């Protein structure tokens, strides 16, 4: 379903967003 797909994308993109945020802080 759409929620399963959204969840997969969220899991994929979340680490990237966190990494970008951490890089900007430094």
UniProtKB/Swiss-Prot annotation:
GO molecular function list: toxin activity
Keyword Cytoplasm: no
Organism annotation: Neoponera goeldii
Subcellular location: Secreted; Target cell membrane
InterPro entries noted in UniProt: Antimicrobial_4
Gene Ontology terms: cellular component: extracellular region; membrane; other organism cell membrane
Protein name: M-poneritoxin-Ng1d
Superkingdom of origin organism: Eukaryota
UniProt keyword terms in alphabetical order: Antibiotic, Antimicrobial, Cytolysis, Fungicide, Hemolysis, Membrane, Secreted, Target cell membrane, Target membrane, Toxin
GO BP of this protein: defense response to bacterium; defense response to fungus; killing of cells of another organism
Entry's family note: Belongs to the non-disulfide-bridged peptide (NDBP) superfamily. Medium-length antimicrobial peptide (group 3) family. Ponericin-W subfamily.
Transmembrane intervals: none
Tissues and organs where the protein is expressed, per its UniProt entry: Expressed by the venom gland.
Signal peptide (from-to): none
Keyword Membrane found: yes
Functional summary from the UniProt entry: Has a broad spectrum of activity against both Gram-positive and Gram-negative bacteria and S.cerevisiae. Has insecticidal and hemolytic activities. May act by disrupting the integrity of the bacterial cell membrane.
